[in-house]
Amino acid sequence: MEVDVLKRVPVREQDPKVRATNFEEVCYGYNKEEAMAEASRCLNCKNAQCMKGCPVSINIPAFVEQVKNGDFTKAYEIISESSALPAVCGRVCPQESQCEGKCIRGFKGDPVSIGKLERFVADTARENLSLIHISEPTR
């Protein structure tokens, strides 16, 4: 997939005529190829400002790097170290004013779609439960 590093990989959405007839999510999210292409736009900054904008301090460069490499299990593990609700946060967290708002890529072009990548990782883990390690109860 050809990637313009200044532009986000577009996210697929329901056609407006179809979505007017249902209550399904409008945004379909990324598929594997789209997620890897979007992740390849990340500059993997040493002093990652995106992490400073994340209220739960997810190691964003590390999980995005794993998405770029196609290791979605590792990406999920990294996100899960800080967030118990990645599928929710990937949908409702105001990324444009938090992590994506601090993304260096956004100074010239579009910031990396961190929220959409988080959503992709969480949805992929949920669809493939074998990717998720569930710890034994502690009590």
Predicted regions and their residues:
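Short, contiguous pre-domain boundary segments
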Residues: 7-26
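Ferredoxin-type iron-sulfur electron-transfer modules in oxidoreductases and energy-metabolism complexes
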Residues: 20-37, 59-91, 108-131
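Local cysteine-cluster metal-coordination motifs and their immediate loop/turn environment
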Residues: 40-59, 86-107
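Residue-level detector of conserved catalytic or cofactor/ligand-binding positions
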Residues: 130-138
